[in-house]
Structures are given as structure tokens and as C-alpha cells.
Amino acid sequence: MSSKEQKTPEGQAPEEIIMDQHEEIEAVEPEASAEQVDPRDEKIANLEAQLAEAQTRERDGILRVKAEMENLRRRTELDIEKAHKFALEKFINELLPVIDSLDRALEVADKANPDMSAMVEGIELTLKSMLDVVRKFGVEVIAETNVPLDPNVHQAIAMVESDDVAPGNVLGIMQKGYTLNGRTIRAAMVTVAKAK
């Protein structure tokens, strides 16, 4: 008897039995997979969620670092700008007594004396030249009278009664003040008018 002719106890050929069993397995598998969730799919979904969260944290971290770098760059630029603007402050403070001395020399000089006129003219030119040079570097003189007292640029020394100047205004300058690029480096010492 050949293998094709061999029959199983039920009367089926072996190939038919294998095919029938395979169809039964295929029919059972879809039902089983519909009822059970593959644990690998859950793990994949969990890992994808963790990855998305990690990417979001990374993006936020990068944005924070970029913002910090930009702020640091701006602060550094401002610091450098201030350093350039106010680098001369110490030097200007050393020059102020010299400028004050030239001012006092002009105040006490006998301008009516013809013998002194050359010296007075020399002092005036020296003072003018020095003030022109410091102005080029942002220094301004505070020496206006009849302006309201400003505590940022004036230091009141005395109150004096006056009919000519409004109360609270600067009546006279005892010592000139100076600013460097808008910042007061020495307040002007002034007398202030008060009502009679």
C-alpha cells in the first residue's frame, strides 16, 4: 500500500488532517488575540510616551539655555558699554581739582590790571581747552543758576533770602558740579533761594 493510499483510523489522509488542524488553529488564534492585548504593544506605547516626554524636556532645556545665553550676552554688552562710558571717571575726578584751581585763579585775578591781562588770558585759554577736551569724553559742567534745586546734581549748602530768584531755586554756585555721560560724578555745591 502506498503512502497516498494510507488512511487514518477516521478514513482521512494525513495531509487532510494537517490541513484541518491548521484551519482550526487559525480560527482559534484571532479570537485569542482579540481577547488578550500583547504586552509588547503596551511596552512600546509606554516607551513612546516616555520618549515624547524626554524630547519635550530636552526642547525646554535647550530653550532655557538659549534664553540664558542671550541674557548673558545682553548683560555683558551693557557691562562693556558702561565700562567704556565710565572708564574715565577716576581720571576725570583727578582732573576736577585742577579745573577748580583754574576757575578760582580767574575769580581772584585782577582783570583790570594791564600787566595781568596776558596771564588772565592764558588761564582762560587753558581752562577753556581743558573743558573742551573733557566735554569730548562726555563730561558736562553743572553751573546753572535760577533753576529748581535737583538733589541728583545739586548739594544745598545754605538757604539765602532773595527777591530775584524764586524760592527753591539755585541762587549761587559755590563749587561747580560735573556729570560723565549723564551720571553725576560730583554734585554742584549751591546756595538756594528762600522767601523773605
Curated annotation (Swiss-Prot):
Family of the protein in this entry: Belongs to the GrpE family.
Gene3D superfamilies according to UniProt: 3.90.20.20, Head domain of nucleotide exchange factor GrpE
Protein name: Protein GrpE
Gene name of this polypeptide: grpE
Region Disordered: start-end pairs: 1-39
Alphabetized PROSITE patterns for the sequence: GRPE
Protein purpose: Participates actively in the response to hyperosmotic and heat shock by preventing the aggregation of stress-denatured proteins, in association with DnaK and GrpE. It is the nucleotide exchange factor for DnaK and may function as a thermosensor. Unfolded proteins bind initially to DnaJ; upon interaction with the DnaJ-bound protein, DnaK hydrolyzes its bound ATP, resulting in the formation of a stable complex. GrpE releases ADP from DnaK; ATP binding to DnaK triggers the release of the substrate protein, thus completing the reaction cycle.
GO biological process terms held by the UniProt record: protein folding
Originating organism: Escherichia coli O139:H28 (strain E24377A / ETEC)
One Pfam entry name: GrpE
Keyword hit for Transmembrane helix: no
Keywords of the record: Chaperone, Cytoplasm, Stress response
